[in-house]
């Protein structure tokens, strides 16, 4: 089943120019893609190529200058109030900048309950139980519930944001560099959790990343973005190779997970 369909998407930002005239900076150019239920897709590209802007458009935080975005066959621009509420529940996003994604005055308990209060019909006791369950799933415990964001480490806060997104059991989870910054052990644990969610609920995942190792470990398809365009799409196999210049540059930039020991024939 197709969850998300994007056709001919273009976007630009206006900024001031000389003589008070606005100039337009193109960020996305004729982007088209589809995401199906239960699949895991990576959007790979260097910083500044338009990945995060595309993500904001996909979740409805901004409206595109041109093109169409449809959720389960319905254009986002035509969703009624009830459909838009269901859309906000079904598609969740975890941002790279976790500090800006939360209210620093609220406790973790309040942060986790917020989407459940607005998007689900759960009693307070059920919300608290699910909050505890989601914390455990991201390797945190109830001791953080009464803490506020400034009292948490960056990795802890990122996992709180992930738990908040998972609490409403979304159909599509978009992670904007949200896993790449975790250490390898935590990253592996989060990936196991996401795989479990896919099996249970058919959750689709879109990883927005520059981390090729993450793509190879978890994704089924990868789209390469460069200068606001998707320049290549590949199925992830045993040996992932790219045909585009942008893809090859990213692949060549990957460092080995562990130092490679050089063999030497010199005798001491």
Swiss-Prot record:
Positions that bind ATP: 45-52
Domain ABC transporter: start-end pairs: 4-252
This protein's GO CC annotations: plasma membrane
Keywords tagged on the record: ATP-binding, Cell inner membrane, Cell membrane, Ion transport, Membrane, Nickel, Nickel transport, Nucleotide-binding, Translocase, Transport
Entry's localization field: Cell inner membrane
Alphabetical list of InterPro entries matching this protein: AAA+_ATPase, ABC_transp_ATP-bind, ABC_transporter-like_ATP-bd, ABC_transporter-like_CS, Nickel_NikE, P-loop_NTPase
Major site of localization recorded for this protein: membrane
PROSITE patterns reported for this sequence: ABC_TRANSPORTER_1, ABC_TRANSPORTER_2, NIKE
Broadest EC class assigned to this enzyme: translocase
Recorded family membership: Belongs to the ABC transporter superfamily. Nickel importer (TC 3.A.1.5.3) family.
PANTHER family to which the protein is assigned, alphabetical: D,D-DIPEPTIDE TRANSPORT ATP-BINDING PROTEIN DDPF-RELATED, TRANSPORT ATP-BINDING PROTEIN
Quaternary state and interactors: The complex is composed of two ATP-binding proteins (NikD and NikE), two transmembrane proteins (NikB and NikC) and a solute-binding protein (NikA).
Protein name as it appears in the record: Nickel import ATP-binding protein NikE
Species this protein is from: Shigella sonnei (strain Ss046)
Gene label: nikE
């Amino acid at each position: 089943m197709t969850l998300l369909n994007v056709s001919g998407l273009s976007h630009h930002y206006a900024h001031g120019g000389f003589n008070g005239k606005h100039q337009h900076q193109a960020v996305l150019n004729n982007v088209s893609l589809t995401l199906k239920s239960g699949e895991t897709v990576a959007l790979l590209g260097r910083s500044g190529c338009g990945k995060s802007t595309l993500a904001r458009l996909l979740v409805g935080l901004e409206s595109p200058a041109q093109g169409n975005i449809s959720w389960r066959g319905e254009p986002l621009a035509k969703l009624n109030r009830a459909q838009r509420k269901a859309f906000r529940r079904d598609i969740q996003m975890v941002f790279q900048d976790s500090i800006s994604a939360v209210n620093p005055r609220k406790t973790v308990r309040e942060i986790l309950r917020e989407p459940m209060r607005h998007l689900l019909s759960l009693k307070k006791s059920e919300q608290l139980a699910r909050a505890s369950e989601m914390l455990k799933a991201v390797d945190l415990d109830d001791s953080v519930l009464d803490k506020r964001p400034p009292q948490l480490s960056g990795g802890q806060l990122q996992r709180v944001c992930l738990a908040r997104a998972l609490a409403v059991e979304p159909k599509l989870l978009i992670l904007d560099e949200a896993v790449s910054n975790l250490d390898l052990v935590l990253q592996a644990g989060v990936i196991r959790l996401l795989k479990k969610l896919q099996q249970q609920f058919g959750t689709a995942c879109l990883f927005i990343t520059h981390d090729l190792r993450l793509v190879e470990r978890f994704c089924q398809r990868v789209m390469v973005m460069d200068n606001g365009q998707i320049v290549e799409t590949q199925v992830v196999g045993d040996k992932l190779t790219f045909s585009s210049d942008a893809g090859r540059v990213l692949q060549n930039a990957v460092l080995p997970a562990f130092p490679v020991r050089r063999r030497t024939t010199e005798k001491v």
